[in-house]
Amino acid sequence: MAHIPVLLKEMLLQLSPQNGGIYVDATFGAGGYSKAILESADCKVYAIDRDKTVIKFYEDLNIKYPSRVKLFIEKFSNIRSILDSNSLEYLVEPSAVSKLSSIISSGIQKKNIWISASSTGVTPSNTVDGVVFDIGVSSMQLDDGDRGFSFLHDGPLDMRMDNSSHTNASTFVNALREEEIANTIYNYGGERHSRRIARAIVNARKKKTIKTTFELANIVRSVVFRGKSKIDPATRTFQAIRIWVNDELGELEKGIKAASEILNKNGKLIVVTFHSLEDRIVKTFFKSLCEPRSIDCKVFSLLNKKMIKASAEEVNANPRSRSAKLRAIQRLS
């Protein structure tokens, strides 16, 4: 299914893009947030994503909004260096997009087509009017069996958002110690049967290497029974492994902290999360900036005292939005 950006209206209402503004879409994906921001004001968007497959969506957006959007293939935790022209490693310029798209689609990577930003005149730090994050895995990634994110599609055990990384889901299930597997599945997936699952994984890999998503899902299902639950027994395990492979919580912590440091006066930071681990990180960080005892209390203000959730209408149209939570802060000085 196509990726539908969640809480889109709510994000725009909080961000309130202005003509002449500069905004960062830290999780570009299919470009839904970037497109909405560009449509709502005569502004510029710097988009970030570590997944090179999103370039095709950037290409379409750049045709419609030439010179108003740039895509950086990077981790959003590096947002400060991305906006610092002296240390940026990769920049996708409009002139390079077609060439890069064809190379990526053929499965060949050539570093020399990535253009250095050492003299691109990229906006320096502390000069953006807003940063938005839509955290987690996208529908496009889940639906592509070759990416190995989902137990609904058979494919290699991968789960990397950045396929240049050397650590993938196969590393997790075939190389980690039983205790590490159990602790990760418990801490990142909230799976109370984590030790049983870890033992089953280790026993299975003694017989042969676990290679596919279906193999792993069936191993989990063999020791965890669904009963009356509508949730597949493999759901929490797959979530935990994906978070581990991509260091999602570490990236989120570093990303939102860095984003808060590059905002102009009145600049806004908006984060949409999809599970409690992510939301807790955002809530705790925002509170640390905005509570009276914080030295940053007079610098930041919460835009909404409680998180914003999707309406019943949106949930009916896009079930993925059911667990989405939006939190936002504004820089005051």
From Swiss-Prot:
| Residues bound to S-adenosyl-L-methionine | 31-33, 49, 76, 134, 141
Q: Which Pfam families match?
A: Methyltransf_5
Locations listed in the record: Cytoplasm
By its UniProt entry, which InterPro entries does this protein fall under? Answer: RsmH (IPR002903), SAM-dep_MeTrfase_MraW_recog (IPR023397), SAM-dependent_MTases_sf (IPR029063)
Assigned EC number: 2.1.1.199
A molecular function annotated in GO for this UniProt entry is:
rRNA (cytosine-N4-)-methyltransferase activity
What's a GO cellular component annotated to this UniProt protein? Answer: cytoplasm
For this chain's UniProt record, which GO biological process terms are given? Answer: rRNA base methylation
User: Which keywords appear in this protein's UniProt record, sorted alphabetically?
Assistant: Cytoplasm, Methyltransferase, rRNA processing, S-adenosyl-L-methionine, Transferase
Enzymatic reactions: cytidine(1402) in 16S rRNA + S-adenosyl-L-methionine = N(4)-methylcytidine(1402) in 16S rRNA + S-adenosyl-L-homocysteine + H(+)
Q: Which family does it belong to?
A: Belongs to the methyltransferase superfamily. RsmH family.
- What function does the entry list? Specifically methylates the N4 position of cytidine in position 1402 (C1402) of 16S rRNA.
- Record-given protein name: Ribosomal RNA small subunit methyltransferase H
Organism, by scientific name, is Wolbachia sp. subsp. Brugia malayi (strain TRS)
